[in-house]
A protein has these predicted regions:
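A short core secondary-structure module
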Residues: 1-33
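C-terminal helix-coil-helix/basic helical segment that borders enzyme active sites and/or dimer interfaces
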Residues: 103, 107, 111-114, 125-186
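Structural beta-strand/beta-sheet cores of well-ordered domains, especially the beta-sheet scaffolds
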Residues: 2, 18-19, 28, 45-52, ...
């Protein structure tokens, strides 16, 4: 099944003429072509989708006609907020994995490495507390912490841990045994990924659900109250 946001009224401005549809992938005229990404030819999490005179029954309409933008933004906000739990746990686990990999090597006493590691630990704690604050506010019926901030900190935090591992471990970052973790934020059977694999895969998190650039724009306008550029 696909959730598609389609233009249903071309005569209204901007976001008003979009509707949300559930589309069966077996529908005649619809073709999904999986394609590999940086993680390798067997990593097929993404597809390009083609529609050739596809007909979708009206019962597949989600919500009201031309109300798709509200549904889209609501779904994205929910996704960004709920993924906070995975981002937070994944960040803690990745940092612990890196500390284990460094062990008692000279890096464990390197000031530059320790400074970067300390910054990541602070960011991980800030992410956790920000998420808890948002949940507490929701329980009281108040506005939650901005979901875009949670998404931005979580996804970029995973990338930054992997980047530090690459800088610190050098060629060892290509060794799958150096990156093994019981926590698998990228999906089942990928817990043996090397730090290099983790680094490549981390970019998916900074793109899906709205890129980091989009999140920064949202934070600037809706949280900080800055004017639209």
């Amino acid at each position: 099944m696909l959730l598609a946001f389609v233009r249903t009224d071309p005569d209204v401005p901007k976001h008003r003429g979009i509707s949300a549809l559930i589309i069966d992938t077996d529908t005649p005229g619809l073709e999904c072509r999986p394609f590999p990404d940086l993680m390798g030819p067997d990593h097929l999490d993404f597809n390009e989708v083609f529609f050739d005179d596809v007909v979708v029954p009206r019962r597949n309409l989600v919500g009201d006609l031309n109300d798709g933008w509200r549904i889209c933004t609501g779904a994205l906000a929910h996704e960004r907020a709920m993924l906070w739990v995975l981002w937070s746990e994944g960040l803690d686990t990745s940092i612990a994995d890196l500390v284990r990999c460094v062990g008692d090597t000279p890096l464990a006493e390197d000031d530059v490495f320790l400074d970067r590691l300390g910054s990541l630990l602070i960011d991980a704690e800030a992410l956790r507390l920000l998420g808890y604050r948002g949940l507490a506010r929701l329980q009281r019926g108040l506005v939650a912490a901005d979901q875009s901030l949670l998404k931005l900190m979580g996804s970029e935090g995973q990338r930054d841990v992997a980047l530090l591992a690459l800088d610190a471990l050098g060629a060892d970052a290509l060794d799958q045994r150096k990156g093994t973790s019981v926590f698998q934020p990228w999906g089942a059977n990928r817990g043996d990924a090397s730090w290099f694999d983790r680094f490549l895969n981390s970019f998916a998190g900074t793109i899906s659900g709205g890129t980091s650039e989009i999140q920064r724009n949202i934070i600037a306008e809706r949280v900080l109250g800055l004017p639209r550029g």
